[in-house]
Amino acid sequence: MTEAVNRGAEQVEDSTGTTFFVPLPPDGRYTRGTYQHDAVTLAIMMLGSVLVRRTEAGIIRSRIVETEAYAGPEDKGCHAYNGRRTARTETMFHDGGTAYVYFIYGMYHCLNVVANATDKPEAVLIRAIAPLTDDDEARMKQFRRIRSRKAADLCNGPGKLCQALQIDKQCNGIDMMHSDDLWMEGGTWPGADRIVCAPRINIPYAQEYESKLWRFYVQDDPYVSVNDKQAVPLTAAWSALYEAE
């Protein structure tokens, strides 16, 4: 594996003239400290990073282009809202860098990366990825078994990307810092001016947290699952991202 090198943080000025710093992922494999940021920060940081999956057909590398943050016990959209600790959510209470995989609608798996430290149940849902090479795309097609002419259909949604990468409940609980089957590496962060924020998808039960701008994606990337016409640039939304209700 590639040794990680800390790249520090990028200084950005928002629309009000306020300066903020976005931590950047390392060169090489993610470290424990990288995963231990809060979910909102990690969700932003993960954009442009490389998700690596070892499959029976070989290694597949993909670029993360869309994420959602789930911010723990106070977040009514989070599985661990109000400290809910069940057999299903137990993985969220593990250390940052643990894979949290769950099954929805009786047919799809979703891959999340646990954020923060042990017993601070936050996570980042990976909503969309893009294959890095033609070989990566070919392996994804093998597992998705689709003939769509639109390459983005392979992995422009959380269920689709799990099928394309052969991710299921057996991956739940994997420590992505040490695993040889599933891990993340720092890629090329797109920059604050290319990232937009929007409300998370399909969480009507989250009440006032439904409108939180905790979905992040690379603007105009063809692999993004849903482009929101009301999306707000990261540089305009930064101060609101961390406001408590």
Regions found by a protein language model. Give the residues of each.
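Conserved, well-structured core segments that form or line functional sites
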Residues: 2-245
